[in-house]
Amino acid sequence: MNRQFFLTISLLLLASNTLFAGWVIVQKTYDASEGAQGEIEEILYFQDDKVKMMSEDMATIFDLNSGEMYFINYQTRNYWTGTAQEMEDQVKAAMDEMIEQQLANVPEDKREEMRAMYKQMMAGQTESDAHSRPSDLAVTIEKTTEKSVVAGLPVTKYRVIVDGKLTEEVWLNTDAGIHNEFSVQKFYDFMAGFLKSFQNQETYKDQEAYVQMAKQGYPLKIIDRAGAYETITEVTSVEKKNLSRSDFLPPNDFSEQALTDMQTGFN
């Protein structure tokens, strides 16, 4: 999911049921080796620095202004809401609880030793991640002369070179105005706090050259070679549409739950 986040950005300014022009974007993501048969479809909603990402029965909403986020499960009809810091605190609390559950069957005179060992393992992982931060990565963005059309919109191909290796190819649209609906810098700052709960690690996408490219337009197609598999994300539909504040909130009849009780794919 991290690879798709930089494609999605938005914001809310006015009252609850008032309509504003926003964007609805449909995209598909799949591994190049599997082709279309393994594709996952996602619907993205943008408006005034708010973004909603829907996939099957799940939705994730980010408010870049307030720092609030929602995880919504439409199948179980519940949701979790909070900030990135609150999520990090709850994840840590859940890990501490898991450790205590593991210690329940350990003889009492051995528990403190085992507890210290678990804590050391967790601290060691954090330290390892910190040392692996690629702050010194050489990231170069090459704008090519290659033009194309994706989802009915003109795009220009960019090449992302990381330490001399072609890592991404990005087809960027600069004239539809999608990227004017959000602050790219605000989005990256928000996501840095969000992803901290899952990985204490930067990526080449945090580098200034990459962020500056993202500010120039909206990516309608990406070939990502950074991971073990070549992943392709391609927009299939772009629509400017009136959206309301309620489009970026859980339904009124859904119940709020603790993060650890949510079936979100994050816990």
Feature map (PLM): residue ranges:
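Bacterial N-terminal signal peptides that target proteins for export
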Residues: 1-9
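Prokaryotic Sec-type signal peptides and long signal-anchor helices
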Residues: 9-10, 198
